[in-house]
Amino acid sequence: MSKDKKNEDKETLEELKELSEWQKRNQEYLKKKAEEEVALAEEKEKERQARMGEESEKSEDKQDQESETDQEDSESAKEESEEKVASSEADKEKEEPESKEKEEQDKKLAKKATKEKPAKAKIPGIHILRAFTILFPSLLLLIVSAYLLSPYATMKDIRVEGTVQTTADDIRQASGIQDSDYTINLLLDKAKYEKQIKSNYWVESAQLVYQFPTKFTIKVKEYDIVAYYISGENHYPILSSGQLETSSVSLNSLPETYLSVLFNDSEQIKVFVSELAQISPELKAAIQKVELAPSKVTSDLIRLTMNDSDEVLVPLSEMSKKLPYYSKIKPQLSEPSVVDMEAGIYSYTVADKLIMEAEEKAKQEAKEAEKKQEEEQKKQEEESNRNQTNQRSSRR
C-alpha cells in the first residue's frame, strides 16, 4: 500500500512539473503576444500621427474629428493592451483557451469600428456657385419687393434752385411729379421730368439731381429778359427765347436801364431778339428804344434811339449785319445825328432832320390847303350851277 501511494505521489509531482512547464510556456507566449500587440498599437499610433501631419491643412472640423478618433484609437489600444495583460493573468489563473481571447479581440475591434465616425465630405465649389446664383437674385428680388410695398418707396424731398422770375411751385407743377410717384421712377425717367420742366416758357434748362436717400434737387436756368414791350404805363418782359410775357411787371421791379420795344408782333419780336443776340454787348447796351418806321421801300424798317440821342434807321432783318457800322461812324458825329442804313449808309444831324420834317410837314399842309381850296371851288361851282337852274325854272 505504501508503495502504491508513493507511486501515486510521484505521478502527481511529475504531472505538476509538467503542468508548471506548460504554464511557463503559456505565460511566455502570452507575454510575447502582448508585447507584439503593444508594439503594433504604437506603430499604428505613429502612422496616425504622420497622417495627421499630412492632413493638417484640412478644415478644423475634420481635424477635430480625426483627433477625437485618434484619441479614441489610442485609448482603445491601451485598453486592449491592458485587457490583454489582464486576460493573460486571467488565463494564468483560469487557464482559458486561446479561442476565447480571439473572440474578445474581435468584439473589441468591432466596437472600435463602430466608434470611428466617417469624415464629412467636402461640398464641391460648383454646387456652391450654383446655389449662390439662385439665392442671390431671389434675395435681391425679395428686398426690392419689400421696399416697393413700404412707404419709403414714394418718400421724396424735392427742392428747387435757380428760380428768379418763377416760383418753386410753378416748377414742381410743370415737372408733373406726384406724391404717389415711386422714387425709382424719378431716377429712371429723369430726362422725361426735365423735359416737362422746360415746358415752362421761363425755363431755358433743367436738371434733376438725386442725393441719397430721398433728396431731389431741380436746378433750373431761366431765360434772360432782353427788353420790355411798353404799352402805356405797362411793361411786359421780352425773353431771350423770343417769348413775350403776357403779364406786366411792376415799375418797382424794373432795372435802372433797359431796352424799350414799341411793337408787339410776335414774329417781329422773335426776329428782333434773334438779331439782337448776334451783336456785341457794348452795342446792345447803347440802344435805348426800338420802334417801327416802315417806308415805301422797306416794310420792316425800324428806328433805334441810342442813349446818346443818335437815331439809326435799319431794316429789322439786317440789323445784326449793318448796325455794327454805327460804332465806326459814331466818332465822326459831332452832334446828335441820324444814321440811315436803309439802302446805303449816310448820316445827317438831328437838326437837319427837324428841318426836313418841318419842310415835309409844310409841303403836306400846302397840299392839304390846295386840296381844300379845290373842294371849296367845286362846292361854289356846284352852288352857282344850282342857282342858275333854279332861276331858269322860276322864269318859266
Curated annotation (Swiss-Prot):
Q: Name one GO biological process term.
A: FtsZ-dependent cytokinesis
Region span, Disordered:
1-23, 37-116, 361-396
POTRA domain sequence ranges? 153-223
The primary site where this protein sits is membrane
Q: Name its cellular compartments.
A: Cell membrane
Please list the residue ranges that the record marks as compositionally biased, kind Low complexity. 386-396
Annotated Pfam families: POTRA_1 (PF08478)
Keywords, A to Z, come to: Cell cycle, Cell division, Cell membrane, Membrane, Transmembrane, Transmembrane helix
Residue ranges annotated as Cytoplasmic topological domain: 1-130
| Gene Ontology cellular component list | cell division site; plasma membrane
Say which domain of life the source belongs to: Bacteria
> How is it placed in the membrane, per its record?
Single-pass type II membrane protein
Instruction: Name the residues that span the membrane.
Output: 131-151
Bias (Basic and acidic residues):
37-65, 75-116, 361-385
Residue intervals on the Extracellular side: 152-396
User: Which InterPro entries does this one have?
Assistant: DivIB, FtsQ_DivIB, POTRA, POTRA_FtsQ_type
Keyword hit for Cell division? yes
Q: What does this protein do?
A: Cell division protein that may be involved in stabilizing or promoting the assembly of the division complex.
Family affiliation: Belongs to the FtsQ/DivIB family. DivIB subfamily.
Q: What is this protein called?
A: Cell division protein DivIB
